[in-house]
């Protein structure tokens, strides 16, 4: 980082931007989708607090670091080649743009093109003409929200598929208890251990995380 000559206002903005890193870690990486799928899976099984939220977020963070490791490595190389220059706002903008290029490429690759086009059309309607005319599909102002929406949509699609077999187990257990005249027995009492057994037998956690990893190839 070049700090021999720097503008105080630029330096203050740079420090403020660093405080946004935790939020960017959520919205600009695979953390959002992975954490959503893990939480939905826990709810589908029926164990509301096992694993606890902190444990699931820790698993999601570890999985995110695994998936994003090549991207972070490329960003580190970019910043090493072109250190942040705080001498002016334009130089800082150029340094940051070059540094986040690998992350932007990752988000663009994993963004639904239809969502990106839709947001670009909305920008034409909502933004001033001189601003919307200068924005293309590679602009972070479009890529970040499009990526977030794509991750949300993909997470709910995966969650729906995860719910199906567990709902089938609930229905089967309920019908069997009804046929046996055991209406006083709560279906969850029997379906919960069956769902946990099924998930363990198919090595569910490993298969689930593998599927999430491969979705970013």
UniProtKB/Swiss-Prot annotation:
Biological processes per GO annotation: protein secretion; symbiont-mediated perturbation of host programmed cell death
Location relative to the cell: Cell membrane
A single GO cellular-component term on record: plasma membrane
Membrane topology of the entry: Multi-pass membrane protein
InterPro entries attached to this UniProt entry: T3SS_IM_P (IPR005838), T3SS_YscR-like (IPR005773)
Cell membrane is among the record's keywords: yes
Membrane spanning stretches: 11-31, 52-72, 158-178, 185-205
Function: Required for the secretion of harpin.
Protein name: Harpin secretion protein HrcR
Taxonomic classification: Bacteria, Pseudomonadati, Pseudomonadota, Gammaproteobacteria, Enterobacterales
Gene name for this UniProt entry: hrcR
